[in-house]
Amino acid sequence: MARTKHPAVRKSKAEPKKKLQFERSPRPSKAQRAGGGTGTSATTRSAAGTSASGTPRQQTKQRKPHRFRPGTVALREIRKFQKTTELLIPFAPFSRLVREITDFYSKDVSRWTLEALLALQEAAEYHLVDIFEVSNLCAIHAKRVTIMQKDMQLARRIGGRRPW
């Protein structure tokens, strides 16, 4: 028996979507609130479709902002950050964190030189980048593209790092 092509069957037409009305606000205006009116007077009805001079309003089409496809901006940012050499963690919050940690563990050490803080920040960022690289490899090995907590835990276990 020969195969035949069956045309697509259309269902009944769906109701048209409700259009949003940006000209009128659902909230009552100041004049309506002050006068206690219900908003059904002739002045409010005629003002909805006309401007202050009495001419009908023309609707202006607003262009949608351009959106890139998912992942395009992420890849662009990856390339940008791979090219740069500056530190990505802001210095002030990092130095506050270092001072907070040193206050917690040692009351003797209270002052840090700028070079010591910069060296510590450089090492911390390198460590984070290394962890993320190995975690990404673990996620790819699991046939995923999203890094999960278990990837980071596995990366730390395999790398021989301490559990803290």
Curated annotation (Swiss-Prot):
The modification N6-methyllysine is found at K5, K19, K30. This is Histone H3-like centromeric protein CENH3. Residues 12-26 have a biased composition (Basic and acidic residues). SMART domains: H3. It comes from Oryza sativa subsp. japonica. Its main location: nucleus. The lineage of its organism: Eukaryota, Viridiplantae, Streptophyta, Embryophyta, Tracheophyta. It is found in: Chromosome, Centromere, Kinetochore. The modification N6,N6,N6-trimethyllysine is found at K5, K30. Histone H3-like variant which exclusively replaces conventional H3 in the nucleosome core of centromeric chromatin at the inner plate of the kinetochore. Required for recruitment and assembly of kinetochore proteins, mitotic progression and chromosome segregation. PROSITE patterns: HISTONE_H3_2 (PS00959). One of its GO terms (cellular component) is nucleus. Belongs to the histone H3 family.
